[in-house]
Amino acid sequence: MLAPTLRAARPFGFRFKRILWVCIGLTTLFVFITSEVLLVADYPMYHAYRLQVIADRQLLIPHTLAGIFALFIGPINFSSRIRQRHFTLHRVLGRIYAVSVFVGSFTGIALAWGRPGLPGTSMQAAAWMVCTTAAVVTARNRQIDVHRQWMARSYAVTFTFVSSRVLNLVPAYWNHLGDVFSAVGVIAFTLASLLIVELGLNWHELTTHRR
């Protein structure tokens, strides 16, 4: 009786992962268009921020590149097919991901230095580095299941760089970016992302009664 149950569970898990990655991809595309494309096009509401971006470009360029590397390496390394068939590539990309996290974290803190958003950015960067470090350590210790869990947490923090920009076109939201409300928002997005991952990692235990 167990075999049919397991066979039924696998397609469900596969479909869920596919839907999840599609949603993540569509959200990323939406944010790219409504934030980055409009920023380059000098959208009126973004004009003051555009000037700030130009002024901060020396730190912002490595920060952005690091974030992009982490954002796109994550889904590749979560692929069990790539991990099994191209393990060397998986390890190389994992190292690039880890370096990107630390570069993104420190440049993010440097960009926020002396500004109201520093507490939120520092907390986000700390969570990002801690989760990624735990993922690296558990991988080196060959605790693969635990490694995957920490990578899920790390990528949840990575994705806050996208999720926190979904509402950018809403004036009431955009007008508070850069002030104390922004710092609270970054912390809230980070904690919410980690909470969602924890619920996902423990969903079976939360929904199944042990006999």
Residue ranges and their predicted role:
Residues M1-R211:
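Alpha-helical membrane insertion/targeting regions
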